[in-house]
Swiss-Prot record:
Assigned GO CC terms: cytoplasm; plasma membrane
Post-translational modification: Phosphorylated in response to various stresses. stress-induced phosphorylation is partially dependent on HOG1.
Swiss-Prot/TrEMBL keywords: Cytoplasm, Phosphoprotein
Organism: Saccharomyces cerevisiae (strain ATCC 204508 / S288c) (Baker's yeast)
GO molecular function: channel regulator activity
An example Gene Ontology biological process: protein catabolic process
Protein name: Activator of SKN7 protein 10
Modified residue annotations for Phosphothreonine: 808, 1017
Amino acid sequence: MSDYFSSRPSQTLTPMGNKPSGGGGGDDASSIHSKSSQYLMDILPDSMTLNESVSSIVANNQAKEFILPETDERSPYFINVPIPKAQPTSTTETKKPLAGDEAIDGQFVKEYPTDILVDRFYKWKKILKGLVIYLREVAYAQEQFARINYQLKGSVKFPFLTDIDETTNTITDPFTTAPRGPKKAQPAQKKVGLTDSEQFQMQMQQEQQENAVQAPTDESKMSLAPHEYKPVQTTESDNTSAASGFVKFGSGSIQDIQVILKKYHLSLANQQFKISKEITSTVIPKLEELRKDLRYKITEIKDLHGDFKTNIGAHIQLTSQLLKKYIAAVKFMNAHGIGNDRASPTNKKPHKLDPKHDPYLLKLQLDLQLKRQVAEETYLQEAFINLQSSGLQLEKIIYTKIQHALLRYSALIDSEARLMIKNMCQELQHGIISKPPAFEWDNFVTQHPSCLLNWKSNDPIPPPRKVSDVIYPHMKSPLAKCIKAGYFLKKSELLPTYHQGYFVLTSNYIHEFQSSDFYNLSSSTPNSTKSSAYSSSVSIADTYANANNAKANNHHRQASDVHNSSTTTGGTAGANGIRGIRKKSYLAPIMSIPLNDCTLKDASSTKFVLVGKPTLNENADVRKSSSSTYLSGSSQASLPKYGHETAKIFSKAPFHKFLKGSKPKNKNTKSSELDQFYAAAQKESNNYVTWTFKIVSPEPSEEELKHFKRWVQDLKNLTSFNDTKDRIKFIEDRVMKSHRFKAGHMSRNSVNIGSHTPCLTDSTFTLQDGTTTSVNLKGRAEKPQYIHIQNNSLADFDGNGFRSKVNTPAIDDYGNLITVERRPAQSPHQYSDYMATSGNTTPSYSSGSRPQSMYNGYNPAVSITSNGMMLQQSTANNNTNPTTNLRHQRNISQTSSLPGFSYTSLSLPVNSPGSSNSESSSGGYFAIPLHGNNNNNNYTQRNSEGSSPCYNDDQIRQQQQPLQMQPLSRTSSSSVNVTAMRSTSAGNSITANAPVVPKVMVNNQNVKTVAADQSATAPSSPTMNSSVTTINRESPYQTLKKTNSTGNVPCLTAEKTHAHPAFYKRGNNSAQNLTTSSSTASRVHPIRKHKKNVSFSSLNSLMFSKKGANHGGNLMTNQFMSGGIQEDDGDSTNNDTIKLNQSIYS
């Protein structure tokens, strides 16, 4: 930089004190101040200089008489350069900066050209020093950031997800790649031609191995060994799943998270290392070099201090005197000419003009002085120009160097920031953040059809298969229909004492069973809550069985052993979660009376007499089975008033097991009685016997008597046939005709279910005598013409459709016996509280097989049958619609879930009970009950603070409403309990003006689901009305909307949110922001502090990449502006290598 300042001008001006080389004795000063020129000075006025306030026009007019002011550029007194003030020599040395370039604080800078510039460039020097110190710290910090990011990369441990190899940057699958042991660090001198990233990674690996000894044991325990996880077997055609079971890599699934995080930290560590090396090796050295040069330039500026010493002031004073003398000489000549020595009247002091005062000579002297003055002024001006031009160039160089350093620094920091957004934010936004929450689950379910249902999150809950859906040969045969079933007391000629039995009337037989639970396969153990009255009634049989166990024949003992083993096996399997299958069916009746060999001999209001040939079950222990229901005269009084309770009290175990009685009997007495009973039963077998049947209740009611009368009528009609084919044809034809002809009449005159109890043969539709029929009567009298079944109110009756539904299958989905009649006969004590079913289906608990204790004290309002879920109505219920069917309400915990919107639709499938819509699932897998509430008796409305009321299906109606956005929080602990129901039967109607779901509270916020003028009250009873509608749970998740913003993480914002102070607020509102409770404590990991005195040898020993910097030349290159980001990573030829700075989705 030697060209910063030019040397002093070569020409030299004549000093002001030298005499001119031309003639003339003495200098100008001596000639001016001589006494011989005093006569000229007396002619001049006191001031010849014009006032500065005179305008330029006046100055031009008076320029011939007066001198222009010194501010005018044409004035001889004008100076166009500032005149430096000379400093005393005594103080100059004391105020001179010290050798150590330390400025004196608390004083102003001297107003001298060189001093002011020295001070300015000294400050620039300090700025450069501070900038170098800052950048050196930045380089150190970036190196430490790179180390931290490399350590963070090592903390990303997902042993079963796709990984990235640290050395080759290739994608590896832990289940398909053979595990490799830890690589040993190779000596640095053996590695030739390594890139900066490889050297840095190798150095980081060495440091991690050194720090592994000092690592806390907690972190080592967090790592999981790869052998603890096994790959998931997928189908051969599956190309969407990885070995871990998640969606394959590159699909935006969780499978990508390990590669994204490791790639992010690895690329960021490499970039930070490049930034540190770039600052240390390029930016800082240039600033240090500039600062060193500036030190020399400050010294050169100080050497120009003498160039600003001048006597321009003395020149101006001399010019002023010569100018005045010249003007006086000109005026003297104009007034007197040359003049003379004689006095005259006009010239009292005569004086002759001295020749040396000739105006020419004076003007020549004045011009020479002006020339010297201008030369001095020019010299001073050139000194200023030299100093200022050099200072300008120097400051421009300093400023440009600082600009380039800061520009490079900002480009490096910008590249780091863009790398964060590119390799982290955008990768996550294009990947897992943009996927729906059930993305992984749907793929997981579809890839395992052998062990999971093919049920996606957006699909409705698959309906369970009903027994009525099963098809098998002759499933609708009239031979397999149950006409009636109920309890009676029976005695015969050989058994004069009445005993109770459960009798089933079919198309061909009258079967006697121990109890109404004879078909219940799930009953295997006695109920511990049986009443003592029934226990006492069978105590004789139980004692006899225990006393004579050794006398039992081998056949009976083997049958008992087989059945006991099957029961034990079934119980053990049930304990293991698998339902056992019985090896031997115990549905064989105790006794069967064929209708072909049976005749109704006599009948009264409470009794009827049958004559027939019974058939005993060969595989059953007749003695034990019969004695189980044997009632002595003394024990008959202890019969319960309600015979229907037998289903709850009699054992569900096989027939050879009996309940122990509460009153001990004499052993010999009981043995004789049972021996007599057994002998009588053997005599009755295959012989014509006369039985007497009567009502169980000792004091039957009017309704019981009517029911008994229908039994008598049906027996009379059916026993009139002695051929099975004729009887079956008769039953089927009369059933079809009854429903065909009476469908219209019954639709117009609906019968009140609470006051009328229809059965197989109603009083108005009994077998008529004397009518013609096409059936071959075979000589038997009083053969019926048709049997009428109470039909439903369908106006258009379809015989084939009805035929496909009647009495198929034999038991309903609830495990109850199905009869042909509208509701089966049951124990008389149940009539007052009986709740009839609607339609052509059988009610639940017709035989007393389902104890009411299961329902916490109230009768269930819905029964499940093969034709659907039916409503049961009480006699007190005035809302009677015999054709309205309801879904089944299970006795399970109420669903606690989120409110959704419903559409009016009859054809949409309905989800399973106990669940409601969860977010983004539309009633799919995520509609899982969150909270349980087994108390069905208290259907009360919850407190409005943070809770929502319970609903019952009789108050839930569908209305088509516009979609509204509702505030919602995933951390909600309260939700809406909706009673789930199954699909209804065909023919249901929607109540258009029914009330809708009321306003609820979610997270202490109002959720508006209905209009302002609509309201509904919470039900106080779980009993359902007959008119209900389907809750549509297939509507999409309508409480949140997705807001996309450029460059930001997608947000989920809630509309009309009135947040409670405790309401959880989410920063990004992501779908997918998985929220945590505010009370959840954040996990704090120990952080190792980096020592400040770490050596920079690791940076100085590594060469910067040839692509990372531009040494010399133009700094504005593409590499410079890109901040050092290498898109190809120097590895563009290897297709198997992942690019650290490129998206995995590109």
